[in-house]
Regions:
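Short aromatic-enriched loop/helix-cap "lid" or pocket-rim segments at secondary-structure transitions
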Residues: 15-19, 102, 155-157
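Class I S-adenosyl-L-methionine-dependent methyltransferase module
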Residues: 1-96
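Short, charged/polar "capping" segments at the starts of alpha-helices
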Residues: 12-14, 150-153
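Conserved beta-strand signature within the Rossmann-like core of class I S-adenosyl-L-methionine
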Residues: 5-7, 110, 136-148
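A short SAM/SAH-binding and catalytic strip from SAM-dependent methyltransferases
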Residues: 108-123
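Core SAM-dependent methyltransferase catalytic element
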Residues: 155-188
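A short glycine-rich, Lys/Arg-flanked "PGG" loop and its adjoining helix->strand segment in the class I
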Residues: 125-138
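A short acidic, Gly/Pro-enriched loop at the edge of an enzyme's catalytic core
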Residues: 92-111
Length: 188
């Protein structure tokens, strides 16, 4: 699996580039996953938290919890260097740009766009959706936690929706919508 990240934040891109360079030298990347035990988390969320990263890494020693956050639980996962080395960070604004696809890449099978589209108005969301659609292969999927208006003729349609609840707090959850690129006549 290749992972291409698209971000306009130079700090995010620099961080990912440094992690990739370190991975090429054989160094793993450690992810710290905090969880507040005072919150009544959904059992499925806790099971997910306990197993996150198991397919690409191994448990690691978590960071020390600062005294001000006493009680916070942290799970750490050391991601294998060969996984991190497959990340390709790209500086790209999905509203006004799209990734140029070469002959070796017909488009992505999956694009995950969470906590992104919410920052744009309806017009910008439409532009972003058009660019994301062009980057998908025919039949490819886009997952978002922000429903966007579908524009007839854009070549993408909503194919599913799910609400995911993390805890008993009212704002702890997401509404995941998935869209599928419709193959155009010349792509069939």
């Amino acid at each position: 699996v290749d992972v291409v990240t698209l971000d306009i934040n130079p700090q995010v891109n620099a961080h990912l580039t440094q992690a990739k360079q370190a991975a090429r030298r054989g160094r793993p990347y450690t992810i710290q996953l905090p969880r507040d035990p005072q919150v009544r988390w959904n059992p499925d969320f806790i099971a997910y938290w306990r197993s996150f990263g198991d397919q690409v890494g191994v448990p690691a020693t978590p960071a020390r919890v600062p005294p001000a956050l006493a009680g916070l639980q942290i799970r750490a996962v050391r991601v294998q260097p060969e996984v991190v080395a497959r990340i390709e960070p790209v500086d790209l604004n999905i509203v006004v740009q799209r990734l140029a696809l070469d002959a070796n890449r017909e488009g992505f099978d999956l694009i995950v766009a969470t906590n992104i589209l919410v920052y744009y108005d309806a017009f910008e969301q439409g532009l972003a959706l058009a660019n994301l659609t062009r980057m998908l292969r025919p039949g490819g999927l886009l997952l978002s936690n922000n429903a966007v208006p579908e524009v007839p003729g854009m070549g993408i349609r909503s194919v599913g929706y799910r609400t995911t609840v993390y805890s008993d707090r009212p704002d702890d959850g997401d509404h995941i919508v998935w869209y599928q690129k419709i193959a155009s006549r010349n792509e069939r």
